[in-house]
Amino acid sequence: VTLAKTITISNSHNYGDMEVKAVNSGGSAYCGGIVGYANKAITITSSSSNGAFTVGKDVTIKDNLYFGAMVSMTGTTFTTTDCSSTNNAQGKGFTTSASVSQFYPGWVGKGATTQVTHTIKNCWNDTDFTATTDFSAGSSCYMTLGISDAVSGAKCSYNIENFTASGDLNFYGNANALFYAGSIFGYWRGSGTMKITNCISTGTHTYDATFKGRTTIAGLVGYKSSKPGITFTTCENASDI
């Protein structure tokens, strides 16, 4: 299945929730979520919402639908620029769900040899900013927001620049899988980077990775031979980091 190549949202404002939404269900085929199996990029520019700002909510897989998701296994970029929200941003454009039936931005499928980059620039949120990655079922698929494939050495990067939150700034990676569960920055031979630059929060900055299941993964930076880089530059807050 090959769907759209590019999705662009520019100069948009919504007084309620703002959602870019796609639902895929049923069948036994490769399905690619919002931008398809062979997509190029998603760009959200100068957009704001007085409610929640969510991209990729309820992108659901059922009955042997594999890979794809919002960025596919072919490599692409996901960029959110000049965006704002007056509600909890839930990762500023990244949906959060504990259900394995959800596809997330950046899912790199098993066997992929891809590079995926997420960039969030010039964004603010007047409550908490939370980027949460949950994986909670037995599966040989992997988590998101910089998860690299466990076999092929895929590389994913996650960049946050010039971000302001008037609440907490949280980054969590949680896995409760019965099989391979990655970490925020890569797994096994995979590698990736995370750069957090000029981020301000009046609450707590939290970077955490918790893993429960058959395979225990150690900490924020991945497992085994992954060599991710984590960079914090000019970040400040009014509480702990």
Residue ranges, per PLM feature:
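Surface-exposed loop/turn motifs in large extracellular/passenger domains
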Residues: 1-241
